[in-house]
């Protein structure tokens, strides 16, 4: 009797392997193994790839488990903080520029010295040589 049950088990094993081979040759996809593009996941219920963006509206769909975790919510205060920092930098730059200009303006002499060479007595060619 043990020999008959062993044969039966062997037949079942061969039959199972044969069915698995036929299934793989036929191209039938196992759930979760379909070659979906990035941002989509295989839905066993619908037998096609579904977009992961729809998981926000329906998070309990069967294909949402294959999607990566949802990206974190964007930081909404980024632009106001960045704008404030740039504005502060611009105002401080203008203020420091004005203070430097005012200080240098105070030291500047309003008349420039005039060099008197005596007219035509000293030609430019003589200075170069």
From Swiss-Prot:
Residues 28-80 are extracellular. Highly expressed in heart, placenta and kidney. Intermediate expression in lung, skeletal muscle and pancreas. Pfam families: stn_TNFRSF12A (PF12191). InterPro entries: TNFR_12. One of its GO terms (cellular component) is plasma membrane. It comes from the Eukaryota. Residues 1-27 form the signal peptide. Disulfide bonds join 36-49, 52-67, 55-64. GO terms for biological process: angiogenesis; cell differentiation; extrinsic apoptotic signaling pathway; positive regulation of apoptotic process; positive regulation of axon extension; positive regulation of extrinsic apoptotic signaling pathway; regulation of angiogenesis; regulation of wound healing. It is a single-pass type I membrane protein. CDD domains: TNFRSF12A. TNFR-Cys repeats lie at residues 36-67. The chain crosses the membrane at residues 81-101. It is found in: Membrane. Its main location: membrane. Keywords: Angiogenesis, Apoptosis, Cell adhesion, Developmental protein, Differentiation, Disulfide bond, Membrane, Receptor, Signal, Transmembrane, Transmembrane helix. Residues 102-129 are cytoplasmic. Induction: By FGF1 and phorbol ester. Receptor for TNFSF12/TWEAK. Weak inducer of apoptosis in some cell types. Promotes angiogenesis and the proliferation of endothelial cells. May modulate cellular adhesion to matrix proteins. Associates with TRAF1 and TRAF2, and probably also with TRAF3. This is Tumor necrosis factor receptor superfamily member 12A. It comes from Homo sapiens (Human). The lineage of its organism: Eukaryota, Metazoa, Chordata, Craniata, Vertebrata. The gene is TNFRSF12A.
């Amino acid at each position: 009797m043990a020999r008959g049950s062993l044969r039966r088990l062997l037949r079942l094993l061969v039959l199972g392997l044969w069915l698995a081979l036929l299934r793989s040759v036929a191209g039938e996809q196992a759930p979760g193994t379909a070659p979906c593009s990035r941002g989509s996941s295989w839905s066993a219920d619908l037998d096609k790839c579904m977009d992961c963006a729809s998981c926000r509206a329906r998070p309990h769909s069967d294909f949402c488990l294959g999607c990566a975790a949802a990206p974190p919510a964007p930081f909404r205060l980024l632009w106001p903080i960045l704008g404030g920092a740039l504005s502060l930098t611009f105002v401080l730059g203008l203020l420091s520029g004005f203070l430097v200009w005012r200080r240098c303006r105070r030291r500047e002499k309003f008349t420039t010295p005039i060099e008197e060479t005596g007219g035509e007595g000293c030609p430019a060619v003589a200075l170069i040589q």
